Structures are given as C-alpha cells and as structure tokens.
UniProtKB/Swiss-Prot annotation:
Localization terms from the record: Cytoplasm
GO cellular component, one term: cytoplasm
Gene Ontology terms describing biological process: thiamine diphosphate biosynthetic process
Annotated metabolic or biological route of this protein: Cofactor biosynthesis; thiamine diphosphate biosynthesis
Protein name: Thiazole synthase
UniProt xrefs under Pfam families: ThiG
Subunit organization: Homotetramer. Forms heterodimers with either ThiH or ThiS.
Sequence similarity: Belongs to the ThiG family.
Annotated gene: thiG
EC number from the UniProt entry: 2.8.1.10
SUPFAM superfamilies: ThiG-like
Organism: Pseudomonas fluorescens (strain ATCC BAA-477 / NRRL B-23932 / Pf-5)
Amino acid sequence: MSNVRSDKPFVLAGRTYQSRLLVGTGKYRDMEETRLAIEASGAEIVTVAVRRTNIGQNPGEPNLLDILPPDRYTILPNTAGCYDAVEAVRTCRLARELLDGHNLVKLEVLADQKTLFPNVLETLKAAEVLVKEGFDVMVYTSDDPIIARQLAEMGCIAVMPLAGLIGTGLGICNPYNLQIILEEAKVPVLVDAGVGTASDATIAMELGCEAVLMNSAIAHAQQPVMMAEAMKHAIVAGRLAYLAGRMPKKLYASASSPLDGLIK
C-alpha cells in the first residue's frame, strides 16, 4: 500500500534519540522530585532555563547538572525569560560557555509576561544570528505556518510551534495550523507548550509531530512522577497510531460483523 507510513529515527543535530518526549526542569517542588519525574518520563533531552537555573554560573549553589548529568542526558539550554533578540543571543552564548562548546539550544523570545506568546520578529532576528554563529537552533514559535517555514529556511534544525499558551494546559488549540506546518515541514516539528495531560500529547503525535516538549503538565500534576510515566506511554501510543493510520470517519454506522450468513 502506497500510503503505509514507516517509522524513521528521531534525529536532532546528528544524534538519534529513542524517546520522543522532551521535558523541562522548572516548577517542581525540589531537586529530588525533578530527578524522579524526569527518570520516569524516559526522556533523553532535558531543557533548562539558563537565566533561572544554575548549571554552573553560580558556584556554591545547587547545580542542576549534579542530578541530571550531561553524560546521561542531552542538556537543552533555553532562553526562557528573554524578551528581545540581544538577550536571547547573549544567553545562548553563556550556555555554550558553561557547557563546554555545546551548540544545541532552544530559542524562545517572548512578547509579554501575560501571554508568553513568542515575539516572532525578535525570534527571527535571534535565529539568524545564532545560526550564523554555529548554534543548532530549536525554536519556539507561533503556530503560523509562514513563520515556521521561514525559521526552517533560515537554518533552524527544528521548529516548535505552541499548542496552547505556556503553562495553560489547554491542549492542542489549533490542530489545523499545526497540520499545515507538518505538511510543509523540512525539519522536525515538535509541539511546545499547552499540553495538559496524556491525551494532548497523544493527539500531537497522532497528527505527525516528531516529538513533544512539556514541563507544566508533569510538574503541576497532583502526582508528577506518575504523570511523567503516563506521558511516556502517551507519546509511544500517539506515534504508533500515527504510523498505523486511523480509520476514516463516517457519518453513518457500519456493522462490525458481516451480514452474509445470518442465522434466520
């Protein structure tokens, strides 16, 4: 069958990953809960807000890398808390220095504190500089397919459209824009922000996303470690459903059992 989908590896910056779940490190009660939840998630890529989390820039304070060692996890420094391109570029340079030349970064440039929507103009400016400086840029963006295309053409290695506002747990608010982005994508597309529970993650994967990044959905759950495990299974289920191909939707019923040979 020509429409049968075959799985392909999840590759970022030349490295292949088994888990398609990426997780954040903020909002947990303490370091131990952070460690346990991330272990339960099965994630291999962990994103860290460089401006809010100590990864070596504050000697003498607890260092997140003590519980999430870079030899076990791929650390994905992000620019959360940056509101212009200059701040974002400076933060990425600091992260590269702290992580011994590490080039993989998650770029996010926010528009305001109320919505945490991406400022796409500043994001485009920052992305252009970072790509020229040799960074492997994964970029948080709006669900505008044109902006996503421009970021990919600029050289970003992955685009990460929001599913809903950061921290809201509203789920996949605009699956139609996301579908357009996926259809046009020349780089991996990861849903970033808005996921609230396991079914949201599954829907994102069923649509064809390469992976999902989340933080609040796990950290704000009543039992974060249990939710982390639920998310691990949700990602796998969604990917398998995408590869399997769902049945077509119909307006009218269709009997599961054949009508031929009915007992009279």
